Amino acid sequence: MLAEIEVNGRFDRDPDLYFLTVFGDPSLDSNWALRYEGHHLAYNWTFVSGVGIASSPQFFGSNPAEVRAGNKAGTRVLAAEEDLGRDLVSSLSGDQKGAAILDIDVPGDIFTAAEKEISPLENSGISYQDLDSRQKRMLIALIDELASMQPDVIAEARMETIRSEGLDDIKFVWIGGIETGDPHYFRVQGASFLIEYDNTQNNANHIHLVWRDFAGDFGRDLIRMHYQACLLYTSDAADEGLGVD
């Protein structure tokens, strides 16, 4: 379908061009990584012995976001994410919208693009603590929808981490129109994570959606913990005269 849309496009579109890559030696007692990616899809898992599993960056896209002609007309990809975000911003009061909706041009793509390492974006938007009880449930449902694109054990760990960090300061930002079909962007930013969603290209029918971890993309935080533990073990062993080289 995309090949038909992008006549004479820059790239050859082929549904078989998705690749699984293994880095390192997969085992329970080693550090290794697994990547599955292709156009509009990127999963990254880093397995760190004795520490845990990192699951970001995570990227999804769809062009078109909604099929508008032919026998698949009406089919939507990433529909739940778009609808949950729009339902939340539409539920806000006037004052709440003043905090959540930024009066700037809609970006042409997500702000973090394909950066290998990211930092928190501007601390703007409406806070979880400034939502009513129904809106709070809507925001958590939006976050959970993105977390649940992972296996259950990882999704549950993500949500547990987010709750343990505290929900009150999580920020929701919207840019653009709130009616269906309007070019729009939204993000959810917490202490350790960032969700960005953009639907502005191709007449607002082309989605980019990403989950990032400020410290843990590609397992950076887990690898750091692993090496700190190794250094501590080596130091303790040397102190005890165990002859560890």
Region spans (language model):
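Long, His/Glu/Asp-enriched segments that create or flank divalent metal/ion-associated functional microenvironments
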Residues: 28, 32-41, 45-47, 170-232
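Hydrophobic alpha-helical segments, chiefly the membrane-spanning helices
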Residues: 244-245
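Acidic/His-rich structured neighborhood in mature extracellular/periplasmic domains
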Residues: 1-117, 121-124
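Conserved small/polar residues in nucleotide/adenosyl-binding loops
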Residues: 233-238
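Short loop/beta submotifs within extracellular cysteine-rich repeat domains
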Residues: 96-97, 148, 203-204
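Extended, compositionally biased non-globular segments
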Residues: 126-201
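Short amphipathic alpha-helical linker/capping segments at the junctions of internal repeats
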Residues: 1, 157-167, 213-222
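Alpha/propeptide regions of enzymes that mature by internal proteolysis
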Residues: 88, 126-133, 138, 221-232
